């Protein structure tokens, strides 16, 4: 066994404008090819768009959207005796939040082309805050899969 102590989890840093960790997590997930300033610009434009459309605090809309998309359980593929099973497992809150952010960004990227990413992201966040949209559908689909495969929960 290793004698080294386990490394402490580094807490996520907060972004410069909203001073929020969620926004920074979103920026780091939207980041492509190391262009962080572009990622920040996309997020801040999306937040500004949310502010104009809903006249609410964009941070509260973001929190509500992520809370709505965050899954409680997920399915993991497990191979037992030559056959594979989708085994439902509970996931930790940090992992669930990361999944929610990934689903939100994936759903906003899949929105019809023609508008920029900030526009698509803002509409996906507003939809998720209102409990509809593709990211919410993805969460419900995952929960349905977990419910359907509940019989295999003992394979953990």
Swiss-Prot record:
Annotated Gene3D superfamilies: Ribosomal protein S7 domain
Primary localization: plastid
Record flagged with keyword Ribonucleoprotein: yes
GO cellular component, as recorded: chloroplast; small ribosomal subunit
A GO MF label: rRNA binding
Keyword rRNA-binding: yes
Localisation per UniProt entry: Plastid, Chloroplast
Domain of life where this protein originates: Eukaryota
Keyword tags: Chloroplast, Plastid, Ribonucleoprotein, Ribosomal protein, RNA-binding, rRNA-binding
Pfam families: Ribosomal_S7 (PF00177)
Listed GO biological process terms: translation
Role: One of the primary rRNA binding proteins, it binds directly to 16S rRNA where it nucleates assembly of the head domain of the 30S subunit.
Family, similarity comment: Belongs to the universal ribosomal protein uS7 family.
PANTHER family, alphabetized: RIBOSOMAL PROTEIN S7 (PTHR11205)
Subunit structure: Part of the 30S ribosomal subunit.
Name of the protein this chain belongs to: Small ribosomal subunit protein uS7c
Taxonomic source organism: Stangeria eriopus
Gene name, Swiss-Prot/TrEMBL: rps7
């Amino acid at each position: 066994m290793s004698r080294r102590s386990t490394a402490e989890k580094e807490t996520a840093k907060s972004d410069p404008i909203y001073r929020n960790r969620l926004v920074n997590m979103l920026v780091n997930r939207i980041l492509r090819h190391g262009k962080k300033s572009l990622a920040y610009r996309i997020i801040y434009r999306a937040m500004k768009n949310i502010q104009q459309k809903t006249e609410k605090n964009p941070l509260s809309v973001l929190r509500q959207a992520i809370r709505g998309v965050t899954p409680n359980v997920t399915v993991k593929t497990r191979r037992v005796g030559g056959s594979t099973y989708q085994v439902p497992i509970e996931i930790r809150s940090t992992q669930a939040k990361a999944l929610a952010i990934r689903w939100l960004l994936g759903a906003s990227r899949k929105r019809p082309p023609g508008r920029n990413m900030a526009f698509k992201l803002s509409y996906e966040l507003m939809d998720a805050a209102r409990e509809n949209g593709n990211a919410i559908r993805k969460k419900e689909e995952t929960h349905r899969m977990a419910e359907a495969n509940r019989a295999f929960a003992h394979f953990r």
